[in-house]
Amino acid sequence: MDLIRITDVQKTYKTGTVALYNFNLSISKGEFVFVIGASGSGKSTLIKMLYREEKPDRGSIIIGGINVAKLKNRKVYILRRKLGVVFQDFKLLPKLTVYENVAFAMEVFAYDKKQIYKRVMEVLDLVGLKNKVRQYPDQLSGGEQQRVVIARAIVNNPKLLICDEPTGNLDPI
């Protein structure tokens, strides 16, 4: 069974720009998939539709049995609990430290503080930021900010990890 099935998806913006037209894709559990294309070819639009920031004009997007296109706004959290998302523009919370930015992803799921501390420190060590826990996003390089975003995306062990240019700002660890 497919983890993701996208069928005949179309998205046209109000400006008339066609981002996706009759797009189809199936991804099975365990597959590692890259979507590549020129700037403006619809890659980021596709990603936004996968985590339901945007809806397609036509077609269906099924993720783990959930019809994303028909999901009511008040139920979007059900989908997002299963996803880890690495955004190309970071979306870090500027008034929170590195630790707090990553911990936030667990706090919304009501983990206890001990679980949060243990897991956040494991993940920050994994991405090479264990020594930056008290710093704020504006005190980090672009590559370090990107690693915080990656840590936040994986801290909850998501069933699906969606990345929009995840290595764009990374330096070697």
Predicted regions and their residues:
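Hydrophobic anchor residue at the start of the ABC signature
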Residues: 150
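A short, proline-enriched helix->beta-strand linker immediately N-terminal to the Walker B motif
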Residues: 155-159
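Helix-to-loop junction immediately C-terminal to a conserved catalytic motif
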Residues: 51
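Catalytic Walker B motif of ABC-type/P-loop ATPase nucleotide-binding domains
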Residues: 161-164
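Conserved ABC ATPase signature
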Residues: 135-140, 144-146
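Short coil-to-helix segment of the ABC ATPase nucleotide-binding domain corresponding to the Q-loop/switch region
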Residues: 96-104
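Conserved ABC transporter NBD signature motif
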Residues: 59-67
